[in-house]
UniProtKB/Swiss-Prot annotation:
The lineage of its organism: Eukaryota, Fungi, Dikarya, Ascomycota, Saccharomycotina. GO terms for biological process: cellular response to acidic pH; response to copper ion. It comes from the Eukaryota. Belongs to the YCR102c/YLR460c/YNL134c family. GO terms for molecular function: oxidoreductase activity, acting on NAD(P)H. It comes from Saccharomyces cerevisiae (strain ATCC 204508 / S288c). This is Uncharacterized protein YCR102C. SUPFAM superfamilies: GroES-like, NAD(P)-binding Rossmann-fold domains. CDD domains: enoyl_reductase_like.
């Protein structure tokens, strides 16, 4: 099969790559649409992914084979599913989303009740998941958002409860990122907080408020942190959806002055990455790693993350809970820009993400 692999420090389309073998609980899909994520280029640039390993984490397609211990009552050949794959992993280098065939764990696979087709458009606005292009945008961002709210911040999976689950606001820095847009929708539907405060470009304000954001601060403003602190000095729940050294400093400064606060990071940044003079005893940094949901330890660069059964349980429960909400249109995919040359467009997609061409949208390649 064709696949996009890491070769000499680059993403390269290669032919004659073996189709991945199926482990227990996995299904094989004919991959029909894929989406890029920052972690894809990071696996190359930071030498996390092994040479020859298949890249890609977001895939949508049609089941062509059931692996061992897959109940045919739950998944059948011909079903349309979309799911997260740890592409270019040390443990399973022969499996990734950017390939003609991919293996997906049924534990965290989203299943469509209907056939998913190609829309054929160059640009896809946010909306219900009714197409392969839309489905490909979902797995990484929505599953990550679900983990942040349940595993890290302790929300219950209750749909539209009458009172907020937490007596305080949440701050989402990077509200227009893929994870940010998913978090806004979920925080709104789970009624998790008294307010949803987002930091994003003003151009995304209309969409983010439609999702449920209460107030937007523009990160372009030099005094954005001061603006936030002036209006809200009690933020105990904060998520850094951009997740770099600079945004960590800014998010950390927005945390409540006195009461305990948690900043959730999506990378390996810790308190050690916060400038010494800004560190505070009342602020804790927690992390969500989607790679931990596989149920096994994860070698990652020079670190090995231990198996995390609780993260796996949380992800499993979340996918089961949210799947029907996606199917009936209550959760939307984010905007997408579609590339029409299949796997051959993937290296370009990764470069476009790296240089920031994906503002407020996912970049999707269709394999038709």
């Amino acid at each position: 099969m064709k696949a996009v692999v890491i070769e000499d420090g680059k993403a390269v389309v290669k032919e004659g790559v073996p189709i991945p073998e199926l482990e227990e609980g996995f299904v094989l899909i004919k991959t029909l649409a894929v989406a890029g994520n920052p972690t894809d280029w990071a696996h190359i640039d930071y030498k996390v992914g092994p040479q020859g390993s298949i890249l890609g984490c977001d895939a949508a397609g049609q089941i062509v084979k059931l692996g061992p211990a897959v109940d045919p009552k739950d998944f059948s050949i011909g079903d349309y599913i979309y799911g997260f794959i740890h592409g270019s992993s040390v443990r399973f280098p022969s499996n990734g989303a950017f390939a003609e065939y991919s293996a997906i764990s049924t534990v965290v696979a989203y299943k469509s009740p209907n056939e998913l087709k190609f829309l054929g458009e160059d640009v896809l606005p946010a909306g219900p998941v009714r197409s392969l292009e839309g489905a490909a945008t979902i797995p990484v961002s929505l599953t990550t958002a679900g983990l942040v709210l349940t595993y890290n911040l302790g929300l219950n999976l209750k749909w539209e409860p009458s009172t907020p689950q937490r007596n305080g606001p949440i701050l989402l820095w990077g509200g227009a990122t893929a994870v940010g847009q998913s978090l806004i929708q979920l925080a709104n539907k789970l009624n998790g907080f008294t307010k949803i405060i987002v930091v994003a470009s003003r151009k995304h304000e209309k969409l983010l408020k439609e999702y449920g954001a209460d107030q937007l601060f523009d990160y372009h403003d030099i005094d954005v942190v001061e603006q936030i602190k002036h209006k809200y000095n009690n933020i105990s729940y904060l998520v850094d959806c951009v997740a770099n050294q600079n945004t960590l400093q800014q998010v950390y400064k927005c945390a409540a002055d006195k009461q305990d606060a948690t900043v959730v990071e999506l990378t390996n940044l810790t308190e050690e990455n916060v400038k010494k003079e800004n560190r505070r005893q009342n602020v804790t940094i927690d992390r969500t790693r989607l790679y931990s949901i596989g149920g096994h330890e994860v070698p990652f660069g020079g670190i090995t993350f231990p198996a995390d059964p609780e993260a796996r349980r949380a992800a499993t429960e979340f996918v089961k809970f949210i799947n029907p909400k996606i199917s009936d249109g209550q959760i939307h995919h984010i905007p997408a820009r579609v590339y029409k040359n299949g796997l051959y467009d993937v290296p370009r997609i990764l470069e476009d993400i790296k240089i920031g061409k994906n503002s407020g949208e996912k970049l999707v390649a269709v394999l038709n």
